């Protein structure tokens, strides 16, 4: 039987823990206003800088801010609610934007998360010159790691982030990025194999001729070019990040993984993809690698959906500018898909990052 002093000691420890955790319990359940702030992060891959945003819970009333073609459901530079919160970093797809998933960011922030987005250099809506090169294929996860490090070192943000509760989310090439961060290892020679089998797949193989010409200009065959990228996997350090505890991957580019590479994932993954994805066909991507994921804790296949369903529901302005990424097949309601996706993402990160919630 425990002594009275030891029972009292445990009681005091429990009380102290309760007092420390109580604000987190409230924040995990409450829906708050959201603030966001523009950031600039040093890019260790290209040597320049990366723009992005940080979204965070705020006591300020909800509002909408117009940023380019995006209607962001957050107040610019609103004061944050104090206290350390879990962090999720979102990685966009090829040619994407640091605001392409702002609805997911604001949803998570309204439920107690800090969320960071970044614009990947040489692989964004105004510059895709790095696609097919090490700067992108290897550099992307390094840039996410740099974003995490910068926020944890910044006096403005470090006290708002729980360094032990960090997750990543990503779409398409951003989903690929997320998988690398939790341990996946790509085999880039699979690109060549894929394009031999699907030479008319413009979404994946459209740069093959350009890259072949570039390889020849350097005296390399395409096989040697790909081997060079494979050799660059550790050029900027490990692509995995032990600080990242979980990955939420939406329609991930995964045709360049083999079973051994996927088996190296050692943290929880939630996999989302569209049933009728015509950009990253499921049989060569998500559905193919799904059986190899030993740490898969959730999966959702969106019926009839194509690739672009994972982009936020578009504003009227963005729909006019880019109807391809803003359109869905008949029978697919992007707003409803995202409502479910946000609920799933929140539940996934709460569980895998061990965030306490009230009963």
Predicted regions and their residues:
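Domain-level recognition of soluble alpha/beta enzyme cores
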Residues: 29-90, 110, 298
């Amino acid at each position: 039987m425990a002594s009275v002093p030891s029972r009292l000691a445990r009681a005091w420890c429990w009380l102290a823990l309760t007092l420390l955790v109580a604000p987190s319990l409230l924040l995990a359940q409450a829906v708050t206003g959201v603030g966001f702030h523009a950031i600039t992060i040093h890019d260790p891959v290209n040597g320049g800088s990366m723009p992005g945003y940080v979204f965070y819970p705020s006591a300020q009333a909800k509002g909408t801010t117009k940023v380019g073609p995006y209607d962001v459901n957050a107040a610019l530079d609103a004061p944050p609610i104090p206290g350390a919160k879990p962090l999720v970093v979102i990685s966009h797809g090829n040619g994407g934007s640091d605001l392409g998933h702002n609805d997911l960011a604001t949803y998570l922030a309204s439920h107690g998360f800090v969320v960071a987005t970044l614009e990947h250099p040489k692989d964004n809506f105004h510059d895709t010159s790095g696609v097919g090169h090490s700067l992108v294929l290897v550099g992307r996860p390094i840039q996410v790691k740099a974003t995490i490090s910068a926020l944890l070192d910044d006096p403005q943000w470090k006290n708002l982030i729980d360094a032990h509760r960090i997750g990543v989310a990503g779409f398409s090439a951003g989903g690929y990025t997320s998988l690398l961060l939790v341990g996946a290892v790509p085999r880039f020679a699979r690109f060549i194999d894929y394009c031999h089998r699907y030479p008319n797949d413009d979404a994946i193989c459209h740069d093959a001729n350009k890259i072949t010409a570039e390889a020849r200009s350097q005296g390399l065959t395409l096989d040697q070019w790909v081997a060079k990228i494979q050799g660059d996997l550790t050029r900027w350090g490990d692509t995995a990040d032990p600080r990242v505890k979980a990955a939420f991957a939406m329609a991930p580019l995964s045709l360049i993984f083999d079973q051994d590479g996927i088996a190296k994932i050692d943290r929880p993954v939630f996999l989302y993809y569209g049933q009728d994805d015509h950009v990253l066909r499921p049989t060569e991507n998500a559905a193919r690698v799904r059986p190899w994921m030993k740490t898969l804790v959730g999966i959702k296949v969106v019926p009839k959906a194509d690739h672009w369903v994972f982009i936020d529901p578009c504003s009227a302005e963005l729909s006019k500018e880019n109807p391809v990424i803003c359109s869905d097949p008949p029978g697919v309601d992007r707003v409803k898909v995202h409502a479910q996706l946000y609920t799933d993402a929140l539940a996934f990160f709460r569980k895998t990052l061990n965030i306490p919630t009230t009963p």
